[in-house]
């Protein structure tokens, strides 16, 4: 998911304008719209449902729509229509507010013992940021050599892998205290 997020952060205005054929102002509106949707999704989906329903199911639904969102960009550019681009913005915005990033941070907080939590989170963030930077440098070369649709197919593959790993491997931690989770995972409290 972080490779997809890296693409969004570095290249979405370019993609909206050059692949989606939007004006610069509409491209910027799409980015702002996605941010607003992310904000709303964080409050109305993640904060309201994250502790009340199966997190695996919630993650599965949100991760699935994220794969669908990026799939739009694998279509030939002449097939893209405004409703598809708006759907991409809405689906990606929902994910960005209540999908992989939110669950990743939640699970990092829950699954690592307090004693090791900062180190573990720091290491995982370090690795993902390095990979995202490498991917960010690679995207223009991939687009130049193979075209944007190929890059989009890779992004869909990354989103699908993240979706499957999170959906299949999601821990059942909802409604449990950190102490309960720690004892379940390690057999005792980690001192």
List PLM regions with ranges.
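Loop-to-transmembrane helix entry/capping segments in MFS-fold secondary transporters
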Residues: 24-25, 114-124
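Intracellular juxtamembrane helix-capping segments at the cytosolic ends
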Residues: 98-112
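Extracytoplasmic gate region of multi-pass secondary transporters
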Residues: 1-39, 136
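Cytoplasmic membrane-interface "Motif A"-like loop-to-helix N-cap segments
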Residues: 51-63
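C-terminal ends and interior cores of transmembrane alpha-helices
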Residues: 64-79
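Helix-to-loop junctions at the C-terminal end of transmembrane segments
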Residues: 41-54
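Interfacial helix-cap and linker-helix signal at transmembrane-aqueous boundaries
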Residues: 16-17, 48-50, 139-147
């Amino acid at each position: 998911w972080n490779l997809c997020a890296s693409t969004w952060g570095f290249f979405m205005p370019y993609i909206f304008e050059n692949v989606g054929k939007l004006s610069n102002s509409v491209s910027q509106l799409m980015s702002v719209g996605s941010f607003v949707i992310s904000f709303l999704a964080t409050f109305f989906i993640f904060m309201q449902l994250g502790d009340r329903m199966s997190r695996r199911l919630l993650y599965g639904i949100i991760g699935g729509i994220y794969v669908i969102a990026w799939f739009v960009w694998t279509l030939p550019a002449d097939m893209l229509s405004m409703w598809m681009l708006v759907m991409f913005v809405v689906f990606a915005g929902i994910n960005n507010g209540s999908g992989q990033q939110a669950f990743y941070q939640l699970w990092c907080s829950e699954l690592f013992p307090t004693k090791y939590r900062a180190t573990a989170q720091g290491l995982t963030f370090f690795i993902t940021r390095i990979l995202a930077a490498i991917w960010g440098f690679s995207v223009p070369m991939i687009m130049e050599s193979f075209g944007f649709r190929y890059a989009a197919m890779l992004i869909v593959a990354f989103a699908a892998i993240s979706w499957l790993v999170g959906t299949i491997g999601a821990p059942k931690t909802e409604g449990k205290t950190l102490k309960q989770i720690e004892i379940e995972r390690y057999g005792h409290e980690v001192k």
